[in-house]
Amino acid sequence: MQIKLANPRGFCAGVDRAIEIVNRALEVFGPPIYVRHEVVHNKFVVEDLRNRGAIFVEELDQVPDDVIVIFSAHGVSQAVRQEAAGRGLKVFDATCPLVTKVHIEVAKYSRDGRECILIGHEGHPEVEGTMGQYDASNGGAIYLVEDEEDVANLQVRDPNHLAFVTQTTLSMDDTSRVIDALRARFPNIGGPRKDDICYATQNRQDAVKQLAGESDVVLVVGSPNSSNSNRLRELAERMGTPAYLIDGAEDMQRGWFDQTARIGITAGASAPEVLVRGVIEQLKAWGATGAEELDGREENITFSMPKELRVRSLI
């Protein structure tokens, strides 16, 4: 069995920044540090931070007064921000800057009284945060659609004063079809010059398509609640290649690889490389040889840290 590795894979700049914000807050202020929602959707990362003193909660009413709170990479609604400010909580915002970009777009449509359509998955924390940027008091409204059927059933007030945005971690192919359906039904709809799916999502989806074409089975390292990891598994399957979403090596079954010559491995944007290495070691123990890194797109994007958490230079 030969191992092939997708490139790029694993951590993106937004995830790197979010995890580093929690790490630095623990170093600078000491535990406990409260984090609203899992800072990123990866069990290994969350457990590591929990062991170091991070306390993960779903709502601010679970947070005591006079503590530090971090908002997760997925972003939060304006109502959550207002609640934190009203209580005087010290907040560090780990929202991915590319999610913040979508928030800014939605807030602008809200101020203009322009109806907005969000393409995304109901119940995902990023979607909840983005929907929560819209203030309907200016006369507009925001709607959530997931597929072409939702578009066909959607009723808006003014089809000539309408715009769309997207969740950042969707399937590019699926989203393109939904956007086409929106433009066909609402010819005057506005939107971003380029859809809001982030660079890392695009790059990892392109890479898994290449990987699936060169593999007999694909392993996607990522947690079940990770949107972008699930999209990678779906893409591989659409390419006709069996694919499995795994948290790590312990989730693998030896029988998956019977009569298999080529095993492809990728990782979602919130999965650390140490988990990929663990998968490789287990496969080698089962007889796999080598680990060929496929050619891919280089990523050199970084996002700045909050000023109070930046590492000071030693003089």
From Swiss-Prot:
Class of enzymatic activity (EC top level): oxidoreductase
Residues at which (2E)-4-hydroxy-3-methylbut-2-enyl diphosphate binds: H41, H74, H124, T168, S226, S227, N228, S270
Organism of this sequence: Pseudomonas putida (strain ATCC 700007 / DSM 6899 / JCM 31910 / BCRC 17059 / LMG 24140 / F1)
Annotated protein name in UniProt: 4-hydroxy-3-methylbut-2-enyl diphosphate reductase
Cofactor(s) annotated in UniProt: [4Fe-4S] cluster
GO molecular function: 4 iron, 4 sulfur cluster binding; 4-hydroxy-3-methylbut-2-enyl diphosphate reductase activity; metal ion binding
Keyword Secreted: no
CDD domains hit by this protein: lytB_ispH
Enzyme Commission (EC) number: 1.17.7.4
Ligand binding (isopentenyl diphosphate): H41, H74, H124, S226, S227, N228, S270
Active site: E126
Binding annotation for [4Fe-4S] cluster: C12, C96, C198
Note accompanying the cofactor annotation: Binds 1 [4Fe-4S] cluster per subunit.
Keywords per UniProt: 4Fe-4S, Iron, Iron-sulfur, Isoprene biosynthesis, Metal-binding, Oxidoreductase
Annotated gene: ispH
Role noted for this protein: Catalyzes the conversion of 1-hydroxy-2-methyl-2-(E)-butenyl 4-diphosphate (HMBPP) into a mixture of isopentenyl diphosphate (IPP) and dimethylallyl diphosphate (DMAPP). Acts in the terminal step of the DOXP/MEP pathway for isoprenoid precursor biosynthesis.
Chain sites annotated for binding dimethylallyl diphosphate: H41, H74, H124, S226, S227, N228, S270
Catalytic activity: isopentenyl diphosphate + 2 oxidized [2Fe-2S]-[ferredoxin] + H2O = (2E)-4-hydroxy-3-methylbut-2-enyl diphosphate + 2 reduced [2Fe-2S]-[ferredoxin] + 2 H(+); dimethylallyl diphosphate + 2 oxidized [2Fe-2S]-[ferredoxin] + H2O = (2E)-4-hydroxy-3-methylbut-2-enyl diphosphate + 2 reduced [2Fe-2S]-[ferredoxin] + 2 H(+)
Similarity-based family: Belongs to the IspH family.
GO biological process: dimethylallyl diphosphate biosynthetic process; isopentenyl diphosphate biosynthetic process, methylerythritol 4-phosphate pathway; terpenoid biosynthetic process
Pfam families the UniProt entry points to: LYTB
Pathway assignment: Isoprenoid biosynthesis; dimethylallyl diphosphate biosynthesis; dimethylallyl diphosphate from (2E)-4-hydroxy-3-methylbutenyl diphosphate: step 1/1; Isoprenoid biosynthesis; isopentenyl diphosphate biosynthesis via DXP pathway; isopentenyl diphosphate from 1-deoxy-D-xylulose 5-phosphate: step 6/6
